[in-house]
Swiss-Prot record:
PANTHER family assigned to the protein according to its UniProt record, in alphabetical order: 54S RIBOSOMAL PROTEIN L1, MITOCHONDRIAL (PTHR36427), LARGE RIBOSOMAL SUBUNIT PROTEIN UL1M (PTHR36427:SF3)
GO molecular function, a single term: tRNA binding
Transmembrane segments: none
Lineage: Bacteria, Pseudomonadati, Thermodesulfobacteriota, Syntrophobacteria, Syntrophobacterales
Gene Ontology process terms (BP): regulation of translation; translation
Protein name per UniProt: Large ribosomal subunit protein uL1
CDD domains named in the record: Ribosomal_L1 (cd00403)
GO cellular component: large ribosomal subunit
Family to which the UniProt record says this protein belongs: Belongs to the universal ribosomal protein uL1 family.
Subunit structure: Part of the 50S ribosomal subunit.
Length: 234
């Protein structure tokens, strides 16, 4: 296992591993100990009281962060006819049909998110083995298989985040750039956790939000008191 550098260890030394902080305290620690020259992303991990092995306890969804992610998102739309122009007018970086499928077959992957109209899913399915493992496959449950391209493309460009609970019961998601400042980051976190709570499966028993941690791209994790959720979510 690689050893952490002096700056990382210094940042970790400011954190009490036994303490569960408020969101404000945790953000002050996370953003106050930045030691990299680039604008780091703040990530959140929420441990839920669900068992994802059971279909009725799966948590999966999307949220449009009020302050975005602070980075450009390259959107590719699989469409044909007038829908190609609609996608491009909405802000898509790439839009087209079989020609894009062929480019991807050849190894082209210069995009971050994909959307498809339902009538294109047959063609898109041919590159499922390329897109699927990379988390790039359009998905009806996440709203990325649709004819309403204007709405979806604009949401993605504005900072739409897809998430799903992992086998361990943890959900990970980016919350924006450290440079946003505490107020905007808390607004993003609030929107995300509010969405998680709304998606609580009826089959989930006991405490739902069991653990929360935040970290910057290169920084150590900071534990947050799950009860602090009440201070940022109505």
């Amino acid at each position: 296992m690689a050893k952490h550098g002096k700056k990382y260890r210094a940042a970790r030394a400011t954190i009490d591993p036994a303490k569960r902080y408020t969101f404000q305290e945790a953000l002050e620690l996370a953003t106050g100990s930045i030691f990299c020259k680039f604008d780091e992303t703040l990530d959140i991990a929420v441990r839920l009281g669900v068992d994802p092995r059971h279909a009725d306890q799966m948590v999966r969804g999307t949220v449009v962060l009020p302050n975005g992610l602070g980075k450009p998102v390259r959107v590719l739309v699989f469409a044909k006819g007038e829908k190609v122009k609609e996608a491009l007018d909405a802000g898509a970086d790439h839009a087209g049909g079989d020609e894009l499928v062929d480019r991807i077959k050849e190894g082209w992957l210069e995009f971050d998110k994909t959307v498809a109209t339902p009538d294109m899913m047959g063609a898109v399915g041919k590159i499922g083995k390329v897109l699927g493992p990379r988390g790039l496959m359009p998905n009806a449950k996440l709203g990325t298989v649709t004819f309403d391209l204007q709405k979806v493309v604009k949401e993605i460009k504005a900072g739409k985040v897809d998430f799903r609970v992992e086998k361990t019961g943890i959900v990970h998601a980016p919350m924006g750039k450290v440079s946003f400042g505490q107020e905007k980051l808390i607004q993003n976190i609030s929107a995300f956790i509010d969405t998680l709570i709304r998606l609580k499966p009826t089959a989930a028993k006991g405490t739902y939000v069991r653990g929360i941690a935040i970290s910057t791209t290169m920084g150590p994790g900071i534990q947050i008191d799950p009860l602090a959720v009440k201070t940022i979510v109505a």
